[in-house]
Each structure stands twice: as structure tokens, then as C-alpha cells.
Amino acid sequence: MKKRIVIISICIAFGLFWSYKEAVFATFKSIDQYELNKELKNKSIETLTHKEMKQVGEHFVTAQLSVFEFHNKEDVKRKGEEIFVSRGYEQLIQNYYPNRFRDLEYKFTNEEIREVTDESFLYHAVAYVAGTENGKRSEIKVNYDVKVVKVNNIFRVLEQKQYVQ
């Protein structure tokens, strides 16, 4: 009987560890580490691997969160046109706080790829963005659902939802 309790306890402990391992072991990286290489940019959605879909999703989330560092609205507008199929400025202006953050870094947990078709996929993740705000390090946690499509041979965000925690 004691053996059974020990085995069950070990299984529960392992299950708890496994569910939190991503958050514990994920490390912050700078935005340049989330850029897409040329080979990946040239792939079609139907040929992307699961890992590559995550890379594309991470790229778009970091590009959106980078707006926290921007100093003028024209940069926000340009970034919106670069990322979104339409209405990019409206999406990004929500994250625009001029001169608020510096030295941003990003990490991701709970990444999932959902609703994969030949034309699109849905990327879900919890993103953490950390940076210097008024001389102190601040961290924000944001849940993202990003629908990625390829338009004119360029990956773009068709729609997204974000929830700040």
C-alpha cells in the first residue's frame, strides 16, 4: 500500500513539474533572435513544420510587442502595415506608450498550433515581455491568439486576440 502511495505521489509531482516546466525554463531573448530567416520566409504554410509555425508565431508576437519601445506613431503605422493584412495601425496603437520602455526582451510559454489548413494556422502562446521602465525592470504577460496567412508570398497576421494579464 505504501509503495502505491509513493508511486502515485511521484506521478503527481512529475505531472505538476511537466506542466510548469515551460514557464520555468523559458529564457528571455532579444527581438533579433525571433527574426525569420530567408529559407523560412520562402516556405508555404502547408510545408511548414510544427516548430517553424511556432517560429513564425513568435516572430509576429515580438514584432507587435516591440511597439512598446517606439517613439513615434509613424513607426507604429509602418510596423502595422508590415505585419497585418489590414487594420494594423489600430491593432498596434493599443501597445503604443512613447518613451515608456527600453531594452525589451521576450519569452514564450504554452505555445500551441491550432486550426492548421493549407492557407493558415492559429498560433496560441503566452508571451512575456520585459524591459526597463523608469529605470526599473518591468514584466508584462500577454496571451495571444494569432491567425497567420501568406499573402503575396509574405507571411501576415489576418486576425489576432490578445489578453493582458
Residue map of PLM features:
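Hydrophobic membrane-insertion alpha-helices, especially the h-region
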Residues: 6-21
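Exposed beta-sheet edge and beta->alpha loop/turn motif
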Residues: 118-165
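A short, amphipathic edge element
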Residues: 95-116
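Polar/charged side chains located within well-ordered beta-strands of beta-rich proteins
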Residues: 64, 80, 111, 160-162
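Sec-dependent signal peptide cleavage junction
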Residues: 18-34
